[in-house]
A protein has these predicted regions:
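Phosphodiester-processing cores and adjacent nucleic acid-binding clamps
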Residues: 1-80, 85, 90-103, 110, ...
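Conserved catalytic alpha/beta cores of large enzymes that bind or transform nucleotide phosphates
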Residues: 134
Length: 335
């Protein structure tokens, strides 16, 4: 701080990772300066933000847990719904807790499959070259879905690809979808990781040919059926109630992935709110690192400047992953 002052900087911001212990020493430097010296210290933190605003059931419309669900999985040429392509869709329909129908097909991506994807999935160019393209397959899959609620493991990824392809083909899409990763966080709190094979093992469900869409979809369906039973035991009968259950569970927040966020105090109110955020991150939501839920940040946002941070920030990661423009716009709007 003193060096920044001596070099002629008008101000310096302190943004240590997750803590504010440096504030006292910085304040001592300010106290040693002349009272008329305009140099300022901006108090802040580089926090670990978690998105607890995402629901277990996105876009729910009051559906009952006894309804019809399409549990699905896709394999793709990469992670970007914008620039990569679907190479396999596997899905099963679940009605009254039972699998009643299946949908399984390769999709011709009209481009070579990257070697790393072939290594992961076992899907080769030869396996998809004679398949129909997504322009033909997608309407068939939409018809298979009908009015059902979609279910997937890490659903935003799979649904994101389907929605992006619907957008390209000008197919109207208004899906309700349930994420079994989010369900696992609240129903299996003893787990530290929530990959499909980890959750399946915890529930004694067999998973063969992992990273093949139809097999992963079948496994996810069995997981979902067990989760529905666990939810009913808690007297949760609608997707709206399931979302409320997830909202009230701080243990699930502790398991969410983190993004870096820059938080600066604009004034004394902001400084108090900053202290409250840091305290909550350590005392309530700590798990390997101090976590700040988005909902808690919104409650204490007065007097704060919130920035999207570095390459580990939510916005940077979304751009790098090629997220759709609507997703990018929503992230920008938060900051």
């Amino acid at each position: 701080v003193k060096r920044a002052h001596d070099w002629g900087h008008p101000a310096i911001a302190i943004t240590d990772h997750g803590v504010v212990q440096g504030f006292t020493d910085a304040n001592h430097v300010i106290e040693d300066l002349d009272k008329d010296d305009p140099f300022k210290v901006i108090y802040g933190v580089e926090g670990y933000l978690v998105d607890d605003l995402t629901k277990i059931a996105e876009n729910e419309k009051g559906q009952d847990l006894e309804g019809t669900y399409v549990v699905f999985d896709i394999e793709t040429t990469g992670f970007s719904a914008v620039t990569d392509r679907i190479i396999e869709i596997g899905a099963v329909k679940v009605e009254d807790g039972k699998i009643t129908d299946k949908f399984s097909t390769f999709v011709n991506p009209k481009r070579p499959i990257p070697f790393r994807i072939t290594e992961l999935t076992g899907i080769t160019d030869e396996m998809v070259i004679g398949s129909l393209d997504i322009e033909t397959i997608l309407p068939q899959f939409i018809e298979f879905i009908g009015d059902a609620v979609l279910v997937a493991h890490n659903a935003s990824f799979d649904v994101g690809f389907i929605e992006q392809n619907c957008k390209r083909q000008k197919i109207e899409a208004d899906f309700t979808y349930v994420d079994t990763v989010a369900l696992a966080r609240v129903l299996l709190p003893a787990l530290n990781r929530f990959k499909l094979d980890t959750v399946a093992k915890a529930l004694n469900i067999s998973l063969e040919n992992h990273h093949r869409a139809v097999d992963d979809a079948g496994c996810t369906a069995e997981i979902f059926v067990k989760f529905v039973q666990m939810l009913k035991e808690r007297e949760l009968t609608t997707l709206a109630k399931v979302n409320e259950f997830g909202d009230l569970n701080p243990d699930s927040i502790k398991k969410l992935p983190t993004y870096h966020v820059i938080i600066l105090a604009r004034n004394d109110i902001g400084r108090v709110n900053l202290y409250q955020l840091v305290s909550a991150s350590h005392l309530v939501y700590y798990n390997r690192r101090p976590r700040i839920p988005k909902s808690v940040l919104n409650e204490h946002r007065e007097g704060l400047i919130v920035g999207s941070a570095c390459e580990a920030g939510e916005l940077y990661r979304a751009l790098l992953d090629g997220k759709p423009d609507e997703t990018i716009a929503a992230i920008v709007d938060f900051y």
